[in-house]
Curated annotation (Swiss-Prot):
Function: This protein is a serine beta-lactamase with a substrate specificity for cephalosporins.
Active site: 89 (acyl-ester intermediate), 175 (proton acceptor)
Disulfide bridges in this chain: none
PANTHER family: BETA-LACTAMASE-RELATED, D-ALANYL-D-ALANINE-CARBOXYPEPTIDASE/ENDOPEPTIDASE AMPH
Family to which this protein belongs: Belongs to the class-C beta-lactamase family.
Keyword Signal attributed: yes
Protein's name in the database: Beta-lactamase
Organism (species): Yersinia enterocolitica
UniProt entry keywords in alphabetical sequence: Antibiotic resistance, Hydrolase, Periplasm, Signal
Broadest EC class assigned to this enzyme: hydrolase
Biological-process GO terms, alphabetical: antibiotic catabolic process; response to antibiotic
EC number of the protein: 3.5.2.6
Length: 388
């Protein structure tokens, strides 16, 4: 049986048999929310063979936490809302906010050519590539991953210098760690801080994300979950630009706080004006591919969504393939009637975050197994639809 940090008497017949539209007509109790979450996720966990998952649901102005299974099978350590999970590409949402903060504070401009921040790139293929293109995977075909031969700064710049685009900038979206990773590194370059320290000082600490890290300190190692692949424990090893593209670890408690800040930036305390503007700007609609709008890190769909379209878009057969995009010039400001989301994975972890600002609901799902994105999106949609 999956371990849960909630009462096991959640499923009682009178609630479970109500149709979802009946539940949504009045404000739900915590027990009703828990029933919806458990009825959706318990079968998913079993079917996907997921050892552990930490879930946070934001509803009725507050978070509710649900913890399942094991963070460390061998040690018998259960998942809690303080368990650290690898976020994989959900990290890109932090990089997006950090990049927009650099823009707000004047150390980077999205419309600048990349070469203004990387004089190492003297090849003619770079002359029309802007920072915005790197941030939105539209530079012209940078690959999903850097090659294994890139192991240090010298080989990194050699790689980018010899890279040849397949398309003109701003025409095709090709999801790429090599693209947004370089963006993150260059966006903070003029701060004179490392990317990790910049993120700590200007994003993590102001948002009070005290259990969110790129490098997990020794004092927090006991909270770090093991990921599992083929039943074996695994953890990520960050390669070049890994910090910027997939390097953040966090808890469900911190991630729901991060989600709240992104869902309602106006609620941030006074004195955080530039960070507030950065968060809002990260949800700007810069490019459109089908029904999907590309922000900085975040991907958005106009609400209400076509769920099957969003679910299909999340699968690797679409998400990782080149897609023709339309540049939105000027970028469309953040739209509150949006499904704002991001998936993420490492070899042993699978993460998902989604929220609907207009509806003031959202969910974070952190698992220590990489399982298919469409399964995550379907489950989150089912839960959020039942909460409305």
């Amino acid at each position: 049986m999956m371990k849960k940090s909630i009462i096991n008497t959640l499923i009682f017949t009178s609630i479970a048999t109500f149709p979802l539209y009946t539940l949504a007509q009045t404000k739900l109790t915590e027990l009703q929310v828990a029933t919806i979450v458990n009825n959706t996720l318990t079968p998913l966990l079993e079917k996907q063979g997921i050892p552990g998952m930490a879930v946070a649901v934001f509803y009725d102005g507050k978070p509710q936490f649900f913890n399942y299974g094991m963070a460390d099978i061998k040690a018998g350590r259960p998942v809690t809302e303080n368990t650290l999970f690898e976020l994989g590409s959900v990290s890109k949402t932090f990089t997006g906010v950090a990049g927009e903060y650099a823009m707000q504070t004047g150390i980077m401009n999205l419309n600048d050519p990349v070469t203004e921040y990387a004089p190492e790139l003297t090849g003619s293929q770079w002359k029309d590539v802007k920072m915005l293109h790197l941030a939105t995977y539209t530079a012209g075909g940078l690959p999903l991953q850097l090659p294994d031969s890139v192991t240090d700064q010298k080989s990194l710049w050699q790689y980018y210098q010899q890279w040849q685009p397949q398309w003109a900038p701003g025409v095709m979206r090709n999801y790429s760690n090599a693209s947004i990773g370089l963006f993150g590194a260059l966006a903070v370059k003029r701060s004179q801080l490392t990317f990790e320290n910049y993120m700590k000082e200007y994003v993590f600490q102001p948002l009070k994300l005290d259990h969110t890290f790129i490098t997990i300190p020794e004092s927090m190692q006991s909270n770090y979950a093991w990921g599992y692949k083929d039943g074996q424990p695994v953890r990520v090893t960050l390669g070049m630009l890994g910090e910027e593209a997939y390097g953040v670890k966090s808890t469900s408690q911190d991630m729901v706080r991060f989600m709240q800040a992104n869902m309602d930036p106006e609620s941030l305390p006074a004195g955080n004006d530039k960070l507030k503007e950065a968060i809002i700007a990260s949800q700007s609609r810069y490019f459109q591919a089908g029904d999907m709008f590309q922000g900085l890190g975040w991907e958005m769909y106009s609400w209400p969504i076509n769920p099957q379209g969003v679910i299909a878009d999340s699968g690797n057969d679409i998400a990782l393939k080149p897609r023709k995009v339309e540049a939105l010039v000027p970028a469309q400001p953040a739209v509150r009637a949006s499904w704002v989301h991001k998936t993420g994975a490492t070899n042993g972890f699978g993460a998902y975050i989604v929220f609907i600002p207009e509806e003031k609901v959202g969910i974070v799902m952190l698992a220590n197994k990489n399982y298919p994105n469409p399964v995550r999106v379907q489950a989150a949609y089912d839960i959020l639809q039942a909460l409305r």
